[in-house]
């Protein structure tokens, strides 16, 4: 990620306020390849995936990973989704926080844990940059920056798509003669 830079030096002293769009653009620039949409495009969609319908609210909802007697559940708002394991719940939780409707899930379950780590790191990196770049600013500005970053990321993920509903298996089988 490199050094975290303040954008205050880039603007003349006469500038009274930094706009939310400027902070959003700077956060997206500093995140670069470590942003959620970049990880999704380069590391998830590049492999065999299947579609998963989260049916999130389209807005930021409260998301929790719950350990119940029935197993691991992902709670999005008032809905609960049963997940096969903790890694899948963590993976889905990042996209639920963004408010995504349909996403791609890697078919290879051994990849999900690593990707969940990267996605969660990208999520927390984004939150840290919001706090850092909006230091000494109003809570309202921080909220506007947060919501715009979520909507930008959601729009990019929707544009990238969720892949096919069922993964393609392009394997040749032996044919008897």
Where in the sequence are the language-model features?
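Negatively charged, low-complexity tracts enriched in Asp/Glu with abundant Ser/Thr
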Residues: 3-56, 154
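Extended coiled-coil/helical scaffolds and adjacent low-complexity linkers that mediate multimerization
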Residues: 145, 155-160, 164-167
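Long, low-complexity, intrinsically disordered segments
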Residues: 167-177
């Amino acid at each position: 990620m490199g050094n975290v830079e303040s954008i205050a030096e880039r603007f003349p002293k006469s500038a009274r306020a930094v706009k939310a769009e400027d902070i959003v653009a700077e956060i997206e620039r500093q995140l670069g390849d470590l942003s959620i949409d970049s990880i999704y495009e380069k590391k998830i969609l590049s492999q065999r995936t299947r579609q998963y319908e989260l049916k999130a609210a389209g807005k930021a909802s409260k998301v929790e990973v719950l350990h119940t007697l029935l197993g691991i559940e992902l709670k999005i708002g008032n809905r609960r989704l049963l997940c096969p394991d903790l890694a899948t719940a963590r993976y889905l939780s990042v996209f639920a926080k963004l408010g995504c409707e349909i996403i791609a899930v890697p078919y290879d379950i051994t990849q999900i844990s690593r990707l969940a780590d990267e996605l969660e790191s990208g999520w927390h990196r984004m939150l840290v940059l919001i706090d850092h770049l909006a230091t000494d600013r109003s809570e309202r500005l921080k909220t506007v920056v947060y919501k715009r970053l979520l909507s930008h990321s959601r729009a990019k993920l929707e544009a990238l798509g969720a892949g096919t509903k069922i993964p393609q298996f392009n394997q040749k089988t032996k044919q008897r003669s």
